[in-house]
């Protein structure tokens, strides 16, 4: 995965360069569309989602359909797993069926197909429960009481205990932990991205977006860095948030290990014009 193009040699000795084949689950969503739009010159994408996707080979099926996933995973170098329940973060039945059941089906199909790497799209919701406890500086940031992390309050990162704020976050923690299992047991490289708030408008839409806002370009760059990360990364978790002054999750791990360089910032917008 460290090289962007795979070198193939024919029986005649001719050498050609081919783009890595990447299956995108949940390809019809916002992140999938951005990745396909911006990275198709670099990767050979195929899609998998319940809604059709134009412009790339596509399988229209439910993420829990493991037989369809098995067929779609054949011949793939990597899987970018975006599919999840996003309509109702606290609908446990749908989280169980889509976010948990679908993620397990994806890992199983990828492992059986010999996929070398899964980039699993996790979420900041795995940590946003830290905003809830009394006197939380993180909650105060989300409520517009501070314009930056107060002195003495630490930045949190992937090494801190998870504290989900919803069943959605619980489901994503299942995906992270299952990824670690498949990495340890089967040798698959699994990289998890704890995504910040990526919005269709590409700007914060409420005050609580300001700590965790992630510009679309920064999100796409993170996906690219994870798909192309060194083969030596067998399992890891990276926080993805733009350069927001109210940020309370530390993104230095991705900057140092992957060379990720976010350029967006919620500071370009005025929280006074938005609802809490």
What would you call each of these model-derived segments?
Residues 22-38:
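N-terminal Rossmann NAD(P)H-binding glycine-rich loop of SDR-like oxidoreductase domains
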Residues 55-64:
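Rossmann-fold cofactor-recognition segment
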Residues 63-98:
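NAD(P)H-binding glycine-rich loop region in Rossmannoid oxidoreductase-like domains
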Residues 64, 94-102, 170-171, 214:
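Glycine-rich NAD(P)-binding loop of the Rossmann-fold in SDR/ketoreductase-type enzymes
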Residues 105-165:
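Conserved Rossmann-fold NAD(P)-dependent oxidoreductase catalytic core, especially the SDR/UDP-sugar
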Residues 166, 176-201:
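Conserved beta-loop-beta element that borders a ligand/cofactor-binding pocket
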Residues 184, 195-201, 213-235:
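Alpha-helical substrate-binding/gating segment
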Residues 235-261, 276:
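Conserved C-terminal active-site "lid" loop/helix of NAD(P)H-dependent oxidoreductases
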């Amino acid at each position: 995965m460290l090289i962007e193009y795979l070198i193939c040699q024919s029986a005649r000795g001719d050498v050609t360069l081919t783009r890595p084949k990447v299956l995108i689950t949940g390809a019809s969503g916002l992140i999938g569309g951005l990745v396909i739009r911006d990275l198709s010159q670099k990767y050979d994408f195929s899609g998998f989602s319940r809604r059709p996707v134009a412009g790339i080979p596509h399988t229209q099926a439910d993420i829990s359909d493991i037989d369809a996933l098995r067929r779609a995973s054949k011949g793939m170098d990597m899987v970018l797993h975006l599919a999840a329940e996003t309509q109702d973060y606290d609908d446990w039945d749908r989280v169980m069926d889509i976010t948990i059941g679908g993620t397990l089906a994806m890992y199983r199909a990828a492992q059986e197909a010999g996929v070398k790497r899964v980039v699993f799209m996790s979420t900041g919701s795995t940590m946003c429960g830290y905003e809830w406890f009394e006197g939380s500086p993180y909650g105060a940031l989300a409520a517009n009481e501070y314009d930056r992390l107060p002195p003495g309050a630490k930045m949190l990162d992937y090494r801190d205990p998870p504290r989900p704020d919803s069943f959605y976050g619980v489901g994503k923690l299942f995906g992270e932990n299952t990824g670690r299992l498949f990495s340890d047991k089967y040798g698959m490289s699994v990289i998890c991205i704890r995504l910040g708030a990526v919005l269709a408008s590409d700007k914060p839409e409420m005050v609580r977006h300001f700590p965790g806002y992630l510009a679309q370009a920064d999100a796409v760059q993170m996906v690219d860095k994870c798909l192309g990360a060194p083969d030596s990364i067998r399992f890891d978790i990276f926080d993805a948030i733009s350069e927001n002054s109210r940020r309370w999750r530390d993104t230095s791990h991705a900057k140092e290990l992957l060379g990720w360089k976010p350029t967006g910032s919620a500071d370009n917008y005025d929280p006074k014009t938005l609802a809490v």
